[in-house]
Amino acid sequence: MPLSAAIKSSLSVSVRADAKGLVGFANTGYNGITVLKQTYWTSFYMKGEYSGTVLLRLTGTDSGTVYGSRNLSVKSTGGKWTQYETTFEANESYVAENEWQLLFDAATAKGHPLHFGLVQLFPPTYKNRTNGLRNDIARPIADLKPKFLRFPGGNNIQADRPGDWHYPNTDALGLDEYLWWCEDMDMVPVLSVWDGKSYGGIVSGEELQPYLDDIKDELEVTLPLTLLSHPLRAYLTPNTNEQYLLGPPSTPFGALRARNGHPDPWPIQYIEIGNEDDYSGGCDTYPDRLVQIYDTIHASYPNLTLIANNMDENCLPEIPLPGLWHDYHYYRSADDLVAMFNYWDNHDRGDRVLVGEYGCRNDSNPDGVFWSFMQGSCAEAVHMIGLERNSDVVMMAAYAPLLQHFGYTQWSVCTPSASLAYLGIHPADRGEEQPTLFGFESRPNSLTLSTSYYVNRMFSTNQGSTVHKVHSTAGFGPLYWVATSNETAYQVKLANYGAANQTVNIRVPGVGRGVLEMISGPKDASNLPGDIKIVPVSRNIRAGKEGYTVHMPPWGVAVLVVVFK
């Protein structure tokens, strides 16, 4: 039985004639549910004849321990759906094996089925957003001070077939929620649109026209029902001739956006067209599809920046499209990623590039590695230094994968990376048996910040706006560096990709005091769940006669910040 035009299925519960006491159903989450000492919000829609009490609770699956509960009085009828919501306090469970239960009186429910839809349970969310992000997971992301969010990202936009990837996704994370995420973390949104290619086939030519209309609808006419997770999506109809994303609140869809909590138009400036056509058999038709979509968007929004999903000349139009950026994805072993240090040095300075996905992969093992390790994190630092030195070309860069639930993994990349020109995040993809930037599971206190997380945080929270020429008595390797400044400080970033100690003297004009932050560890060392040993250490440092003397241990990464204002 559909709950709405957008939610076409629901749970039907029939009670056996011999049932007694409390009956109902449970949701066991993703390998359990994290239960902490905090307030939980829960909601569900109900339809069917039932007047009485519903018991909502969080319990141990094996132990039966009740950590929190609420009795809720309901009066449901068979003629309509009714939403019920409540909150309750919970005590902490120290195990992952927990479940949410909804129970009702068997005697009262006998003889007619009860229907339930859009069942939800939320802990406190980041900035208290409705349908928002988990606080414990969102905060480490916010601590990175990321600059943009590419969404829905990767194979979630490319899909196994039109509209769907092949493993479970948090589909309640919709267009509004992505944009609130951007607003709450002060990130620039990079909106991906489907370009007609999925792993189940390609739609091109005249057959692409309905999807061109859909892109226009998303931007200026009708928000696609599948992209809006707010309950009001049930009332949206096609061909509403007003604007949701970009329209003023005086229009019907602008008014809807305002009712959803955002009176001002969403600040859409960047749109990427598809995902990885060069890697997955799309090149024969991508040039034509790209032109079709480019022309459709550019005609109405000439000031938007449009991004092709690859840099392959054989996968792009023969005649370059004005103002088009290019996206480049690559994963490498640690040594190969370091070898790409100067990859962008001789690139066309007129080009503009988004490195939408990259990371260090240990390809000596066909399955990659399970955990971020210090050599790989140092390799990423070297590569980030190379990207920052070329930030006139590489405008944005994002590592992938960002995070994962340890029990729900799909592919292996040893560690994530990020650009220092603009640090971005790629939320959709996941690694195999490894924490990527960081990982978690349903057991409390399982959040595991990797060595790469700390390297990325060191770099992303110490960004400059100007890259400076450095006069050096040595060449790059095994020590790599870049010097930048902003309106208040100089930043010097260093990485020692080698097994020997290195000492470097750094002269910074005019100031004699700074702060040095450093992370280092054995080549193969990793942070593991419950065993986080490798973290950055900060200390004050004074300049001597030779400047700031920095001793770089093997596989060490450091950032020197010298404030002049």
UniProtKB/Swiss-Prot annotation:
Residues 1-19 form the signal peptide. Alpha-L-arabinofuranosidase involved in the degradation of arabinoxylan, a major component of plant hemicellulose. Acts only on small linear 1,5-alpha-linked L-arabinofuranosyl oligosaccharides. The gene is abfA. Gene3D superfamilies: Galactose-binding domain-like, Glycosidases. Belongs to the glycosyl hydrolase 51 family. Its EC number is 3.2.1.55. It is found in: Secreted. It comes from the Eukaryota. Its main location: secreted. It catalyses: Hydrolysis of terminal non-reducing alpha-L-arabinofuranoside residues in alpha-L-arabinosides. Pathway: Glycan metabolism; L-arabinan degradation. This is Probable alpha-L-arabinofuranosidase A. GO terms for cellular component: extracellular region. Keywords: Carbohydrate metabolism, Glycoprotein, Glycosidase, Hydrolase, Polysaccharide degradation, Secreted, Signal. InterPro entries: Alpha-L-AF_C (IPR010720), Galactose-bd-like_sf (IPR008979), Glycoside_hydrolase_SF (IPR017853), Glycosyl_Hydrolase_51 (IPR051563). One of its GO terms (biological process) is arabinose metabolic process. The lineage of its organism: Eukaryota, Fungi, Dikarya, Ascomycota, Pezizomycotina. Glycans are attached at residues 71, 91, 128, 303, 362, 486, 501. One of its GO terms (molecular function) is alpha-L-arabinofuranosidase activity. It is an enzyme of class 3 (hydrolase). Pfam families: Alpha-L-AF_C.
